[in-house]
Design a protein with these regions (language model features):
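A structural signal for short loop-to-beta-strand junctions that line the ligand-binding cleft
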Residues: 81-83, 90-91, 118-153, 179, ...
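Hinge/lid segment of periplasmic solute-binding proteins
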Residues: 95-149, 161-167, 274-277
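Short helix-initiation/N-cap motifs at beta->coil->alpha
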Residues: 70-80, 238-249, 260
Length: 415
């Protein structure tokens, strides 16, 4: 009964959002909001809050905004906040893109309507919009789009042609006495490689966020080719399983490395630092870029904590929209190197000429959005890769292995 009440309340305030033209009442009241975000970014975010207040004032808004900062990071907000109706629950909060299914099920995501949905359509179309879509509607505001990995390498060893394909990369490394690191034993890398030739999963939900069905076709022709690609890479003598920045003593000279380590890779290779999109792989005459996840972070608006106060709920939407807007995303890039997903922010002169941004934008064209991921997708591929490593999975029984993998994925609940 309590859950039913929560969703009826969310539906009510959603109607209010559309009916009131999506603008807080201009009566000069004080609106209190709680914001949950990364502890280390508190000072930066509080500066953005002041920018938001100034922008609201310039727009003729007479309200006063008091914003309390809760140090709850985007990777743990779903498990840290136990009661989304509590007075200290966040109105607006940061979350990793793969948390959307969990938060939707908790009723912690307000559906976007009116100008807020138009904001997503106008500036986040494509990748960003995909990250915040559930059951055909938008439920959050994306504000980053750079949680991925791609090739980071030593240009004194590899040329532009070498890094175009994984075969060329591995062969060149072997010829020069070096190694290529690709962390296939970890699901974020290895599981995503299964997307290479077009195999995928899909999850359908009911209106309460419960999983209705998980579908997957990794046991089909596309999945089989991806499995063979993983097998081929792991059998190459130049391949090693790693994703970290190699030490000066290491023989690794190319890594499928995370965007969070860009600065460290640059420090390691200096002027010889190079970067490129995921290399291609060829199986049975078919050539595709190796699959990868591309995730990001979004700002969720919690409709439960406002308890029917439409001014507070709309103010939360206004804050979330501002913090995911062009100016805020540009400032994150300028201060932290965090790549934006806002279409206009991407056109900033410093980004257009940034090699890492160029690679990221190209990779986003074929990378797999990291949204709600079936739970077993984080474990089943690990079993598969482990079988290749220990020799129990060979080309002779690889179809049987991916049949088992696929059955594990569709039989598990989504996270």
């Amino acid at each position: 009964m309590k859950k039913l009440f929560v969703f009826l309340m969310i539906a009510f305030v959603g109607v209010v959002l559309v009916a009131c033209d999506n603008t807080p009442k201009n009566e000069g009241k004080t609106i209190y909001l709680n914001y949950a975000g990364t502890a280390s970014d508190k000072g930066f975010n509080e500066g953005l809050f002041e920018d938001f207040k100034a922008a609201r004032k310039a727009a003729g808004d007479k309200n006063t905004y008091v914003i309390e900062y809760l140090e709850i990071g985007p990777d743990v907000v779903d498990s840290t906040v136990l009661d989304w109706t509590a007075p200290n629950a966040p109105d607006v909060y940061e979350a990793a893109s793969d948390k959307i299914g969990i938060l939707y099920q908790k009723g912690a995501l307000a559906k976007l309507g009116g100008k807020y949905a138009e904001f997503i359509d106008n500036y986040m179309a494509g990748f960003g919009a995909t990250l915040v879509t559930m059951n055909g509607s938008y439920y959050a505001y994306p504000y980053t789009g750079d949680n991925t990995y791609y090739l980071q390498y030593d240009k004194s060893v590899f040329g532009e042609e070498d890094v175009k394909s994984i075969e060329g990369l591995l062969d060149k490394a072997e010829a020069e006495g070096y190694k290529v690191a690709y962390n296939l034993e970890t699901a974020f890398w290895g599981a995503a490689a299964l997307f290479t030739f077009g195999a995928d999963y899909s999850t359908s939900y009911d209106e309460d966020g419960n999983v209705i069905e998980i579908k997957a076709n990794f046991n089909g022709a596309e999945g089989l080719k991806a499995a063979k690609a993983i097998y081929k890479i792991m059998q190459h003598p130049a391949w090693v399983n790693d994703s970290g920045v190699p030490s000066a003593e290491s023989d690794v000279r190319a890594t499928i490395g995370g965007t969070w380590d860009i600065a460290n890779f640059k420090n390691r290779y200096g002027e010889d630092y190079g970067c490129a999109v995921m290399p291609t792989v060829t199986v049975d005459g078919d050539t595709k870029h190796l699959g990868c996840f591309v995730g990001g972070k979004f700002l969720g608006v919690n409709p439960q904590v406002s308890k029917g106060d439409s001014d507070r709920l709309v103010a939360a939407h206004e804050l979330a929209m501002y913090l995911s807007g062009k100016e805020a995303q540009t400032k994150r890039y300028e201060n932290f190197g965090i790549a934006p997903c806002h279409s206009e922010a991407k056109q900033h002169p410093s980004m257009v000429n940034d090699p890492n941004m160029i690679v990221l934008n190209e990779q986003a064209k074929f990378g797999h959005p990291q949204d709600a991921v079936p739970a077993a997708f984080w474990s089943a591929p690990g079993t598969f890769v482990g079988g290749i490593k220990d020799g129990t999975i060979t080309l002779e029984n690889i179809q049987e292995a991916i049949d088992t993998l696929n059955n594990s994925i569709i039989g598990a609940p989504a996270e």
